[in-house]
Amino acid sequence: FLDLDGQEVRELAGTINVNERALSTLHNRLRRLGRFHFVTERESDESVEEILRYLDRGIHVVLEFGRYQNELAAYILVANLLTRRIHSRYVTRSDEAMGDAARKPRPLVITIEEAHRFLSSSIASQTIFGNIAREDRKHNVTLLVVDQRPSGIDDEVMSQLGTKLSCLLDNERDVDAVMAGVSGARELRSVLSKLESKQQA
């Protein structure tokens, strides 16, 4: 499919009776993913399985994106593939361990730095992070969100974060985002406004 040229994609759309523009858009977007060296034609989940084995043994895994650090599509693709597998595995294991605490999966913390890149309103619905924040505490998975601009994070996801730790915020929208859904917000807002650099509340 990815090797087809524009005319061949249009012909395929007619053959399988789908919207030509929709198929062309899909074709173009998939071809863009093909430029990432980690996307290969052969089907394999070895890397994901190895990461899951590390997590099972309690070994920390840090994903660095190196040359792809400015490629949002690479972040979203990898984060989605990996976290969906983690979510699925932890839900299954929690269900299988129902009533047997010894079989529950090892607690896991998924940390997202620069979270607004993954959790903005336009992107959060395309990822599983909202589900993880909302549902996975009962499956021993916790989402740790780290960001200097919490106002860039989807309101639904922010509302699901149980514990919030904040350093000095100088933007009102960021303060409002941290305060949303917090009891005693007025008093805490006063404390936040008086924080020195490197202090937290």
Locate the predicted segments by residue.
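P-loop NTPase motor domains
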Residues: 1-134, 197
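Conserved ATP-driven motor cores of ASCE-family P-loop NTPases powering translocation/secretion/packaging/pilus
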Residues: 130-201
